[in-house]
Amino acid sequence: MDERNPIPFSGKTGFSHFRWFIVALLFFATAINYIDRQILALLKPLLDTELGWTNEQYGCVNSAFQITYALSYVVFGWFIDKCGIKTGYCVSLTLWSLAAASHGLVGSARGFLIARLGLGLGEGGSFPSCVKAVAYWFPQRERHLAASIFNSGANVGPILAPAIVPWIAEVFGWRMAFVLAGVAGFMWLALWLPFYSAPEKSRYVSAPELDHILRDQDERSNSAGPVNWWGLFAYRETWAYLLTKFLTDPISWFWLIWLPDFFYKTRGLNINKSWIHLVTIYSISLGLSLLGGWFTGHLIRRGWSATRARKTGMILFALCVLPVPLALKSSAWVAVCLIGLALAAHHSWATNLYAVASDTFPKRAVAAVAGIGGMAGAIGGIFFPVFAGWLLDQCKNTAGGESTGYLILFGICSGVYVVAFFVNHLLAPRFEQVKMD
């Protein structure tokens, strides 16, 4: 489609910066994406009373999202490679916005499960689209920063949601919170459709900016022809990426799904009181994750190899998560700081991985690899919410109550990144571009 068949450049002369407008669009789409995901978690205490579901049932509803999310990650990876980023993201966002709004039409655990299946089906196209867009629109040295900017939407969404969802639910009812989230997606499409194209085709990109974008993208010579999806599994780099995502992606889902419940069950804070804690957590995460995104790019600009810079970042981010179990034994605001640091480390880790995918595979394969990795992460996310819900139900009647369950879960979250680092390093000691047939 248009990303793969450039037409002659428009001839604009001054140095433009339109690539940053593109990454801003990706940022806002990611923020909307995460608002849609988080609304259910924020309304859980209210829906607990209305629906009478158990923690395990709530976990199953969220696992339903992960099932279709895992499948659609791969489907959209293929679809985006075939039809282009613009069309692929348009279809993805249309599907998930309709599904988000449909949550406001249901009134049972089964109804929410069906709505979550639809949401997962649409949202699987988001990150493959973003990763491939960054690969097309940014030179290597800027990709990590660009990825950290769009991925920071995963923090901004959860900052905005606790601040506005409780108010909407109180004034207009909880159903309207879901409906308005769906409307926001269609508003974003009104900007995406007229402004997005490949940089070679964009009338908003000047010749100097286009030269800058293409300056070190020598993998274009390795980017002709279709992607052999099964063939990707022959590369150790693919396995390194997908296993790392399988281990660490479920941790991000855990925070998103269970944090409002954590503050309610362990601190007695309902959403009208805990929203400020949640906003602060994601604000900390946003600021520090942008710093993390800058950090590895800074090392590369100082002359470090991509391998050395990205692996240094990965191990530092992994170590930052280790103290998070102390949140169970600390004051509410110390817990906020520890969880915020852990979330920032996760998002810095994640943006590092997105940049690694862009560095190690030619652009024609980036969306496919991102899709495979996203599927692996979502498969991990299928099981972890059910396990978390089951564990919390089992601990409910013990002496420590659900706090004991959360202590175990926080312990799992703290150690998995170190394990993932060594798995990744064993399979991919160096991040060098794969030469594909």
Predicted regions and their residues:
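Residue-level signature of mid-helix packing/kink "hotspots" within the transmembrane helices
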Residues: 38, 66-74, 124, 158-159, ...
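Extracytoplasmic gate region of multi-pass secondary transporters
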Residues: 40-41, 233-292, 346-354, 381-389
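Helix-breaking motifs and short loop linkers at transmembrane-helix boundaries and internal kinks
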Residues: 52, 84, 105-111, 122, ...
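Conserved MFS/SLC helix-loop-helix module at the cytosolic interface between two early adjacent transmembrane helices
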Residues: 71-110
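C-terminal ends and interior cores of transmembrane alpha-helices
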Residues: 94-107, 315-330
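Cytoplasmic helix-loop-helix junction between adjacent transmembrane helices
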Residues: 115-155
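Helix-loop-helix hairpin linking two adjacent transmembrane segments in secondary transporters
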Residues: 153-203
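Multi-pass alpha-helical transporter architecture, strongest
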Residues: 188-196, 324-329, 411-437
